[in-house]
Amino acid sequence: MQISSRSGFGYFSYGIRLALTPGIRRFVVLPLLANIILVGGAMYYLFSHLDTWISEWIGQLPSFLSWLSYVLWPLLALTILATFSYFFSTLANFIASPFNGLLAEKVEQHLSGERIGEEGVWALVKDVPRILSREWRKLLYVLPKALGLFLLLLIPALGQTLGPIAWFLFTAWMLAIQYCDYPFDNHKISFHDMRNTLKQNQSKAYGFGMLVAFFTSIPIVNLFIVPVAVCGATAMWVMEFKIQHSPLRQ
């Protein structure tokens, strides 16, 4: 199946079509259920505390910046929603990572017409230790940067103004890495090489990640994002990145 090059935004919307495609839909179910259970519970807790958290945070602004509260409230709300959703989506992805990898494999097979690796339950079971190890690698990459940004948020004025923007950009980049990594990992391409490939294509990576981050922050909609993002990221791999890692190019 031939597909044309798209923007990062375009690959996300294409992921919606792919997730609904006959033959792929059945591989969407388990990643979807994991996300609904974890992210749904997190959103319920978040919305019962969101207003209090934002009011306390904005209350730390110096009096001469109090006029910014009208601008910062929606920005902080979006940032907290995206961060919460990213954290619990990451947890859901960790649990469902073998099934996300399988979904990416089936999407690539659908788009390219080529079989990717072994098939069957035993092949999936054999891959579980490697897949979970890869998820730990992603967490080790994220945590130091997330800690640094969290400390930025604690700085008066700076944390309330630049902090949310920095968090949103960071979340977009990490979501691009999270979902693009599944097809890369299916081909045993190292985390380092995957990250460098995305850095060389930052406009597509950030465009894709920003749209995922935006929809991840929308209640109800965010429950369905994981399989859509896996499908869209795999389409991006097939069209944009796969040729760069072809054995003929090594």
Curated annotation (Swiss-Prot):
GO MF terms held by the record: high-affinity sulfate:proton symporter activity
An annotated GO cellular component: plasma membrane
Source species, domain of life: Bacteria
Coarse class of the protein's main subcellular location: membrane
Gene Ontology biological-process entries: cysteine biosynthetic process; sulfate assimilation
General function of this protein: High affinity, high specificity proton-dependent sulfate transporter, which mediates sulfate uptake. Provides the sulfur source for the cysteine synthesis pathway.
Family as reported in the entry's similarity comment: Belongs to the CysZ family.
NCBIfam families per the UniProt record, alphabetical: PRK04949.1
Stored PANTHER family: SULFATE TRANSPORTER CYSZ
Protein name per its UniProtKB record: Sulfate transporter CysZ
Organism, as annotated: Vibrio cholerae serotype O1 (strain ATCC 39315 / El Tor Inaba N16961)
